[in-house]
Amino acid sequence: MSNNTKYIFLSPHLDDAIFSCSDYISKLTSEGEIVLVITIFSGYPLSQQLQPSAKQFHKLCNLGKYPIEERKKEDRLACERLQCDFRHLSYYECLYRKDRNGNFLYRHIYSELKNEDTLKNDIIKELLMHLDDKCVVYCPLSLGDHVDHVFVNSIGRALEFMRYKVIYYEDFPYVSDSSMVSYMGKTKELK
């Protein structure tokens, strides 16, 4: 039964924490523990023209032109099945983020992480509304070097520096799918 600890799973995208940690989340909730999955990058730029790599990614994943609502629905259903709470933050994932001049920051999802301290601080401020001294925060290891996973990993390290208990989880599919290594190599070559 619950010891008043809240277990918070940081998910870079819709489905990342669920895909990586569903067994453990299910175990926690079945024991009466409080679990909250916070998806960081679940916003979508409805009025923005997509860059070619975003269009290609949508096509590859069969996402359609405006995929976010369907993905949020799937995530809500998964969280309901696992009997955990969820929050969908409205920040954009890397392929949709732009700099101050309106230029896309990242050409592909395996880009090198840029300095986005303002965004990072905004996200941390929003996360702090859900944290207390009894929280355990789960954060991706960023094994596949997806820039958004690396970004969320850096948020985990910042929370750790702030004295929150942070545990890092292996992000699927990167940890188990050898074909992903081949795919990542090809993606890095996209221009």
Short names for language-model regions:
Residues 1-151, 158:
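Active-site beta-strand->loop->alpha-helix modules in alpha/beta enzyme cores, enriched
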Residues 94, 156, 185-188:
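A sequence-level detector of short, solvent-exposed, charge-rich linear segments
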Residues 161-164:
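Short helix-capping segments at alpha-helix termini
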Residues 173-174:
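Acidic, glycine-rich loop-and-strand cores that form catalytic or ligand-binding grooves
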Residues 179-191:
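A conserved mid-domain beta-alpha-beta active-site/ligand-binding segment of alpha/beta enzyme cores
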